[in-house]
Amino acid sequence: MQYKTKAKKSLGQNFLQDENIIRKIVQLANIKKHDIVVEIGPGLGALTRYLLSSSNNVSVVEFDASVIDTLIANCQKYGTPHIYNQDFLKFDISSLENSSNQKIKLIGNLPYNISSPILFKVIKDSDKIVDAHFMLQKEVVERIVSLPNSKSSGRLSVILQYHFDCSMILKIPPEVFYPQPKVDSAILRLKPKNSKELLKNYNFFEEIVKQSFAQRRKTLHNNLKSILKERKIDPSTLPVDTNLRAENLSVGDFVSLANFLS
């Protein structure tokens, strides 16, 4: 592996370099030859090489043009991925060569500074994917997989858990990266749910979740006061206790609340 390229702090780059960890990630992602795999932020190709050994159809989306020559050189013995030199946030998954309309597997070591926008984009593309395996800050993964009545619960966890079964499947120490980050990392698995609770208005559901967590220390009654007043709704008639905080509610509670207020 060549590591000539200097990691760019502005892009949140930390290059994965431990072969055992990389093999473990690919194994956990359960990638087969027929799978269509898209890697987000391949960097220097440490993970890409193993993906090319596992699948016949690997695409990579890399924003940083300066790493692409090194990426190609590092992958040379294993094959050539389809390279898209662009921002994943603007990438159209439908543009992939996929004549059979086969769903894809997403994987990647996500830049810490834009992990949330990427996850919200993945939500929009959830009907096109089989699953996703992302490396993120361990603290972020813990928030995403958190259960009701946890102080880690938040907008991101509720929205993601509405769409996906979310699980933390591997913890990763800082020393397996170059340069070493100051935090631990973990692998998040997202698997689209086969069936979701029906919502009358999805956008309104997102708005209710956002408003409910607007000020975490406040109760639902205080955070949703303007919405309740606008709709002339008595808080005592709601399907949830508005004296609770947002962190106390389950995804199902938020669905019931949004449907009631729609």
Curated annotation (Swiss-Prot):
Principal subcellular localization: cytoplasm
Cellular localization per UniProt: Cytoplasm
Alphabetically ordered keywords of this record: Cytoplasm, Methyltransferase, RNA-binding, rRNA processing, S-adenosyl-L-methionine, Transferase
EC main group: transferase
Cited Pfam families: RrnaAD
Any one GO MF annotation of this record: RNA binding
Catalytic activity: adenosine(1518)/adenosine(1519) in 16S rRNA + 4 S-adenosyl-L-methionine = N(6)-dimethyladenosine(1518)/N(6)-dimethyladenosine(1519) in 16S rRNA + 4 S-adenosyl-L-homocysteine + 4 H(+)
GO cellular component: cytosol
EC code: 2.1.1.182
Family: Belongs to the class I-like SAM-binding methyltransferase superfamily. rRNA adenine N(6)-methyltransferase family. RsmA subfamily.
Main function: Specifically dimethylates two adjacent adenosines (A1518 and A1519) in the loop of a conserved hairpin near the 3'-end of 16S rRNA in the 30S particle. May play a critical role in biogenesis of 30S subunits.
The protein, known as: Ribosomal RNA small subunit methyltransferase A
